[in-house]
Amino acid sequence: MAGLQLMTPASSPMGPFFGLPWQQEAIHDNIYTPRKYQVELLEAALDHNIIVCLNSGSGKTFIAVLLSKELSYQIRGDFSKNAKRTVFLVNSEKQVSQQVSAVRTHTDLKVGEYSDLQKTQCWAKEKWYQEFQTHQVLVMTCHIFLNVLKTGNVSLSNINLLVFDECHLAIQDHPYRDIMKICESCQTCPRILGLTASILNGKCDPHDLEEKIQNLEEILRSNAETATDLVVLDRYASQPCEIVLDCGPYVDRSGLYQRLLNELDEALNFLTDCNISTHSKERDSTIISKQILSDCWAVLLVLGPWCADKVAGMMVRELQKYIKHEQEELHRKFLLFTDTILRKIHALCEEHFSPASLDMKFVTPKVIKLLEILRKYKPYERQQFESVEWYNNRNQDNYVSWSDSEDDDDDEDEEIEEKEKTETSFPSPFTNILCGIIFVERRYTAVVLNRLIKEAGKQDPELAYISSNFITGHGIGKNQPRNKQMEVEFRKQEEVLRKFRAHETNLLIATSIVEEGVDIPKCNLVVRFDLPSEYRSYVQSKGRARAPISNYIMLADSDKIKAFEEDLKTYKAIEKILRNKCSKSMDCGNTESEPIVDDDEIFPPYVLRQDDGSPRVTINTAIGHINRYCARLPSDPFTHLAPKCRTRELPDGPYRSTLYLPINSPLRAPIVGPPMNCARLAERAVALICCKKLHEIGELDDHLMPVGKETVKYEEELDLHDEEETSVPGRPGSTKRRQCYPKAIPECLRNSYPKPGQPCYLYVIGMVLTTPLPDELNFRRRKLYPPEDTTRCFGILTAKPIPQIPHFPVYTRSGEVTISIELKKSGFSLNLEQLELITRLHRYIFSHILRLEKPALEFKPTVADCAYCVLPLNVVNDSGTLDIDFKFVEDIEKSEARTGIPNTQYSAEGPFIFKLEDYQDAVIIPRYRNFDQPHRFYVADVYTDLTPLSKFPSPEYETFAEYYKTKYNLDLTNLNQPLLDVDHTSSRLNLLTPRHLNQKGKALPLSSAEKRKAKWESLQNKQILVPELCAIHPVPASLWRKAVCLPSILYRLHCLLTAEELRAQTAIDAGVGVKSLPEDFRYPNLDFGWKRSIDGKTFISNQSFSAMERESDCRLDITTVPDSATSSAAHHVMYTQMNDQMSVNCTPPCPKSLSDLQGVCFSDDCKAINGITCNGLTNGNWEAESGVCFQKDELIACKQEIPEKSTSFHVQNLPNDNQPILNECTLSKKFLDGNVGKPISDECPSTCTSDINYESGLSSGYSSKTLGPNPGLILQALTLSNASDGFNLERLEMLGDSFLKHAITTYLFCTYPDSHEGRLSYMRSKKVSNCNLYRLGKKKGSPSRMVVSIFDPPVNWLPPGYIVNQDKNCDKWESNETSGESVMANGKIDEDFEDEEDEDLMWRNPKEETDFDDDFLEYDQEHIKFIDNMLMGSGAFVKKIQLSAFAPPDQNYEWRPPKKPPLESAPFRSEFDDFDYSSWDAMCYLDPSKAVEEDDFVVGFWNPSEENGGADAGKQSISYDLHTEQCIADKSIADCVEALLGCYLTSCGERAAQLFLCSLGLKVLPEVRKPVTNTSTRGNYSLDGRTNSELSCKGIEYGYLKIPPRCMFEHPEAEKTLDHLISGFENFEKKINYQFKNKAYLLQAFTHASYHYNTITDCYQRLEFLGDAILDYLITKHLYEDPRQHSPGVLTDLRSALVNNTIFASLAVKYDYHKYFKAISPELFHVIDDFVQFQLEKNEMQGMDSELRRSEEDEEKEEDIEVPKAMGDIFESLAGAIYMDSGMSLETVWRVYYPMMQPLIEKFSANVPRSPVRELLEMEPETAKFSPAERTYDGKVRVMVEVVGKGKFKGVGRSYRIAKSAAARRALRSLKANQSQVPNS
């Protein structure tokens, strides 16, 4: 064995890493990166006649088609005017159509096909002339062409290119030969391209081969060139060390071998002798038997008895299957005979050895030799290699970076990092140093040899390191049809290859199939177990040994070794001949050995600074630098950009090289090197010169490394800001990071408290009922009270004028009321006494009528930021005008019922006297209960037919009088008085949106009208009071109803003024709009755009809906929305089951009502009935939740049987037994958006379906274009969807987002004409990043102006004149015991819990304030983790979360942490950062039934701890006050900036939007002159949340972008080259219906980076960068303006369905873009080919997916067809080209593109596609899990998705994304199929 000296990696001098197999793509240092051989062959073919010797058919097509395309400028003209034609010749008729389709697919040339000799022979000359006239490429069989030439119908001088397929035929006597003879006599012979794959068939003699090639070259007058796939793969790779080992003969000591051999021989002879007459139809009965026995015989021969035994056992099992299925008697007999033989063999073996252990006596010498070789590869122990040096030596050309990033620049600690990474990246680089393949001939040999090696590994520790597997190419060929059986096999094989590729196995035993086409890593050991029998087999197995140090070992038996040595000589000779034929042949066997000594002297290095350690490029390292630079240029997966070097010998001897860089490098001119005395030096010298030039133009940095996209030269662009120092955790700009901001107070309301004797302004709050509540929504058949019917109303008294703002709606019980704020009088003053009176009344309204005062708030109008007064107005002194109603104010001051219950005594002597008029417009207070906080009721009706003696509705009491006597011990003095039907005064103070509509303006489901009617007419469901027992409140009901609207009115006023202020501010900063509006101008009303969505269809009841349809005259006609648009379901559940509702919007502490939510009942002790509990303080809304936690938005149907006999509630003590309780509570997904996780579906986040079309009614010739956007629209842009308002910023944000991208893209494109796309897109992504937008938004002060959370007056609204009192914040209401009865949610004692009017039917699901993060998946995980932690008690909430049952009304409302958190409560963790603390989703998991008083939750202050947790309590944690501050995620601020941009864009146009961006600090326009003073210091917040130093842009003027000057390079022959290159493009221009003025744009749009023949323009990448943004904007804008008014969710889906590569690529193919595409990339060529074929079959577009599906039936192998990105790219780049060519006109681009896109836009708008991955995650949010990617045998990616409990689904594709969507699609198909089968279960 000593003779075997292997160069194993472990023994190699450079340390084992050198031989590591996974150094896949090394960057060469001494030669230019080799280009693909097809590319080189094409280059040769353009230069001279060649014969291409290629192995694969596809490569030949590529060269032939591209060559004809490159020469096509010669054939496009008119045949009669000397244009030429191209002819493809094939040998047989079958091949004609193949060639035709290839040419048609890839070019726009007209192709004629001729295959029928008989038919064409009789054609006359005219007929042929006509054919040549109409076609440019003619494909025909050689016989036809010969005939045409002979008859003189066409002469060869009219042909520019002759392609001979299978040109080797010309050696024999063949038409090809005759055609070439005719060529000889022709003066202008066409260019000739010969294609052959069969120059090497079977064995051939090198001498013959050489002769054959020379012969062929002479006949075809061409040079034969072969591609590298016939020579060892890459001629630049180091050659493996080849070793032939003689293994010696097998000594059969036991005689077993001989016996087995005899048995098998006999059996085989017997089978051969069986002469069964077989008809040709029948199967030969002995075939299977022969096959099996001969396999067994071969194994015995090659591997020995031990293996023969193993294989016999395997075959017996196989035979059993055959025997079982065999029908025919004779066949069975033979099979049974075989079976017997095999069993006999097994028996014989058993006598000699136990089957378990491996005995070396019974294996052949070959096997023993093999095991010896493998022992050599045993790795060393790890410790030896702990030193870092040989880990990575950057100067070696096979330096491998272990980090993922390709962009690593040298830094000191890199090496150490690398070292750590290796530990994790691979199982362990050391144990797997071997990466080997053993080639065997037969399938069974592979299987058994694998078992043998495994067995040997068990017994021999030296071999234990081997982890082997076998692969037998069984059906692995790419294109055979595969059945199920083979499919399984195929999967197994793929798995084997995956493991080998991942180095989980280090040895592969393979049959020859793996020689070809399978993607396998570079091996360092290849063993031919059976000798290669022909050259091809030799070269391909050898070609697998591609690691830098590798061995190619051939094992030979002694008897064969002589013969093989001859063969090997032959192979070597053939290889040498082919090598010389190798295109651009360059034999580098000797290059390595040349001494590289004093090259530096020959040519000095390029050094940056003259010191020793300075970066330098020497003549020896220059080439590596150039290769590295090219590799870093942007390119697609198919193109590996490489430099091109041409070296010529100069006449006087020296060599000179010219270097061409790829066309997307800014250095475009060819670099000519100095003359050098050898070719290699010439190449190195030119590289050195090139490095110098690249450094000078800034493409190499000062370390002489390629400049990454990050180290951009355009620092000013990125405005690299010092990131604010902040202790806030989370990545800036993300949703995870939230910060607090003061809520803005409009300047005009700030410090506006009137002072005595100073001029004041009095505004009247006008209220008009514009849309009365329709009957079907008026459940109680209440009378409607239009506010305009009574003259007394409210006004605002302020010291400052209030700007004009649009009218806006509020929604009261009577319907939609339009509010206007009109100036009544100004310039008057009041004295101190009057002011004090007014102030007291103002306070009275908020503290008593609205009950908004609470300990945390203090009334201090003189100190408060915002302190105007609200006061009653009335028509006074018969003047008919409104004025302050001092008399009324004074009356109230005097009234006894003003605050408490008046103490009136009636007696028999002075009985109660009923006066009807006192009760007509009254609010009454029951005097006998709830003394601390009496209830107030509106009188709805006076029942004159009832008296206290009337029958009581429930059986316990006879009469009303008896009830009061029994229950309250009250005697009535007047038994004839009528009774009063009353309604609760409103507790719902948020009237911004209507109750019966959800946020999108969709009506909620109602129960049937009949049920409701019956219910409301029964006395049991009414509150009936006795007038004598009630006091009358001094404030009349009509005014009270108006007072209830005040919080909503003032809040909306406040917001609109903030928006107006922003509009004025922008007018100053950006010069868009006017600072102050004209006097006579008012913007149109604020409207949700819902007008017509409220129609009969939306209600379940069928009554006509006339009331809503009548538009009142003061309404504008506003763009409206058909139902379909609003169909995405609510994200707020609003239940309208009248009596049993949860009145949701109440705030815990003072809700006035607590009723049922469809079957959620409260029994006395508030325990859960049947698992349904009402739990959770979420954002101050009571949320009802069924016992199931609603996770995400799964469809939940929780059918709960609720016991009929739940405890009744007393309604005025009327027992109420048959309270209607619904029997099921089915919360469908439509109405329930669970509380966990962000809504992902489009059903949720969207609110406003329309953006208000404010243009429609602008009065008096002004327009928002000149004045600036409507404050209503600005407010929309400031409102997050979390605020649950009638509108939000989402639609505007999407529009702004796409315009922002467009504006920045155009700016960068025009400003940096020399930057390549990688840099431009890096700059763009930095500028449009959320982080940057957040910074700009913050600088502008947007966060303070934003509307972030739901308006909930008792919790987060600060009434005017109040301040938050910091000291009292912790006051706490301790005891929960009130007279021993449980306190109900509304603070009443439960025994007189009244079934109140359900004020708010909305079940608001307080939602995270951001809806979509970059990766919505992460969210749910976060939320779930959060909830788990909560439930585990790791948060600040402890295991038993305590919640006071319900806090009583006058408790303070601040969040505080629990009073005494037990020790085990861990601090809050940072993963909670993404919570909106004001809307506490998680709390809904807490169970109130466990509540205890002491750990009371209070709702107004919230202290989330910092990142590192509250453990170190010394740190200040952010706590914020809900009244004056808001907590906003950074990303929401970025969204708001985009929405504001959208708002300016829609209102004022594109130029205004660009100016707006400039004023923000995002440069999208060039500056005309520098500002005089630029005060853009970073804004500091003053208290009011505005920046102190507003960015003053007044000094800067912005100009217009200029089109970059040149699109064509200076070039002597530029025009001529251009005409050549775009010949034929006029047809394309016709097709798209646009003529280019500058054709260079057209050429650039179609030039791929690999197309180096275009020397006059850039490649399409820059235009694609531009076009991408333009199309995105145009399509988004089109969708936004769609009259269907899509909701934000639909808009997002449509946008991603239409703006994606698949759609663009499909359209590009549909409109023939691919035929004009200029690229030289073999892989890309094939992908496009596949895709085009696929599109033809499919002939229709598919949405969303980058993968269009191939046929669906083949479930197992669903491989998606790949969409060539380049096709989508040129679709975009053409848009960019048109934009530039048309002088930057978006209209022109849309004119060309809309007709192409329209059918799809229509199709998708009608039926919105969703990406399969998203759809699956929405369908199965909890259970769908995607696996990491695995590689398949041909290098694709496979992904598996498991839907827990429903199965696993695989998808395959070229990238993870593609495979993932394929897997998701299959999962969906399966899930949907299952759903449809079990609808009823």
Curated annotation (Swiss-Prot):
Domain annotation Helicase C-terminal: ranges: 425-594
Sites where the protein binds ATP: L54, N55, S56, G57, S58, G59, K60, T61
Sorted UniProt keywords: ATP-binding, Cytoplasm, Endonuclease, Helicase, Hydrolase, Magnesium, Manganese, Metal-binding, Nuclease, Nucleotide-binding, Phosphoprotein, Repeat, RNA-binding, RNA-mediated gene silencing
Residues engaged in binding Mg(2+) 2: E1664, D1769, E1772
Principal location listed in the UniProt entry: cytoplasm
GO MF, one example: deoxyribonuclease I activity
Domain Dicer dsRNA-binding fold: 622-714
Chain location of the short sequence motif DECH box per the record: 165-168
Subcellular location: Cytoplasm
Family annotation (SUPFAM superfamilies): dsRNA-binding domain-like (SSF54768), P-loop containing nucleoside triphosphate hydrolases (SSF52540), PAZ domain (SSF101690), RNase III domain-like (SSF69065)
Alphabetical list of Pfam families matching this protein: DEAD, Dicer_dimer, Dicer_dsRBD, Dicer_PBD, Dicer_platform, Helicase_C, PAZ, Ribonuclease_3
InterPro entries according to UniProt: DEAD/DEAH_box_helicase_dom, Dicer_dimer_sf, Dicer_dimerisation_dom, DICER_DSRM, Dicer_PBD, Dicer_platform, dsRBD_dom, Helicase_ATP-bd
Residue span(s) of domain Helicase ATP-binding: 41-217
GO cellular component labels: cytoplasm; nucleus; RISC-loading complex
Binding site for Mg(2+) 1: E1293, D1371, E1374
Enzyme Commission number(s) of this protein: 3.1.26.3
EC top class named in words: hydrolase
Domain PAZ: 887-1034
UniProt-listed GO biological process terms: apoptotic DNA fragmentation; pre-miRNA processing; siRNA processing
PROSITE patterns linked: DICER_DSRBF, DS_RBD, HELICASE_ATP_BIND_1, HELICASE_CTER, PAZ, RNASE_3_1, RNASE_3_2
UniProt subunit comment: Component of the RISC loading complex (RLC), or micro-RNA (miRNA) loading complex (miRLC), which is composed of dicer1, ago2 and tarbp2; dicer1 and tarbp2 are required to process precursor miRNAs (pre-miRNAs) to mature miRNAs and then load them onto ago2. Note that the trimeric RLC/miRLC is also referred to as RISC.
Record PANTHER family: DICER-RELATED, ENDORIBONUCLEASE DICER
Entry function: Double-stranded RNA (dsRNA) endoribonuclease playing a central role in short dsRNA-mediated post-transcriptional gene silencing. Cleaves naturally occurring long dsRNAs and short hairpin pre-microRNAs (miRNA) into fragments of twenty-one to twenty-three nucleotides with 3' overhang of two nucleotides, producing respectively short interfering RNAs (siRNA) and mature microRNAs. SiRNAs and miRNAs serve as guide to direct the RNA-induced silencing complex (RISC) to complementary RNAs to degrade them or prevent their translation.
Name of the protein: Endoribonuclease Dicer-S
Species of the source: Xenopus laevis
Gene behind this protein: dicer1.S
